């Protein structure tokens, strides 16, 4: 696989209300694939994380097309990762005056595309 990382274009979605572990499961499937192949994979995977990842991928390709003048057919997903964001902490009332903490994780999704050929 040959990827030109000099003209790498990326898009970032921040504060997505989803666990980064669950998002990484989806990102591992599209890393290194062509744009067209990644679109097909994301359309048909049964995970909720596919929707924000698909949005970020389309945004990265739009950035490449508009800002760099690259052809979407030649683009390959060169990098895709999810970092942990801040955790929203909530409390659930329990019996006898107690409260359990509920953690609602967020993540930052980054997808980078570059011209190249996927094999």
From Swiss-Prot:
NCBIfam families, per the entry: rplV_bact
Pfam families: Ribosomal_L22
Domain of life: Bacteria
Name this protein carries in UniProt: Large ribosomal subunit protein uL22
GO molecular function list: rRNA binding; structural constituent of ribosome
HAMAP family in the cross-refs: Ribosomal_uL22_B
Role of this protein: This protein binds specifically to 23S rRNA; its binding is stimulated by other ribosomal proteins, e.g. L4, L17, and L20. It is important during the early stages of 50S assembly. It makes multiple contacts with different domains of the 23S rRNA in the assembled 50S subunit and ribosome. The globular domain of the protein is located near the polypeptide exit tunnel on the outside of the subunit, while an extended beta-hairpin is found that lines the wall of the exit tunnel in the center of the 70S ribosome.
GO CC field: cytosolic large ribosomal subunit
Subunit structure: Part of the 50S ribosomal subunit.
Keywords: Ribonucleoprotein, Ribosomal protein, RNA-binding, rRNA-binding
Swiss-Prot/TrEMBL GO biological process terms: translation
InterPro entries: Ribosomal_uL22, Ribosomal_uL22_bac/chlpt-type, Ribosomal_uL22_bac/org-type, Ribosomal_uL22_CS, Ribosomal_uL22_sf
Family named by the database record: Belongs to the universal ribosomal protein uL22 family.
């Amino acid at each position: 696989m040959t990827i030109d990382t000099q003209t790498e274009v990326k898009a970032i979605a921040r504060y997505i209300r989803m666990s980064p572990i669950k998002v990484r499961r989806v990102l591992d499937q599209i890393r290194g694939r062509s744009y067209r192949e990644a679109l097909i994979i994301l359309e048909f995977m049964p995970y909720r994380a596919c929707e924000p990842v698909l949005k970020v991928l389309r945004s990265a390709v739009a950035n490449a097309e508009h800002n760099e003048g690259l052809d979407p057919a030649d683009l390959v997903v060169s990098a895709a990762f999810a970092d942990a964001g801040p955790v929203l902490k909530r409390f659930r009332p329990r019996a006898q005056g107690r409260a359990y903490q509920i953690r609602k994780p967020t993540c930052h999704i980054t997808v980078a595309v570059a011209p190249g050929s996927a094999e």
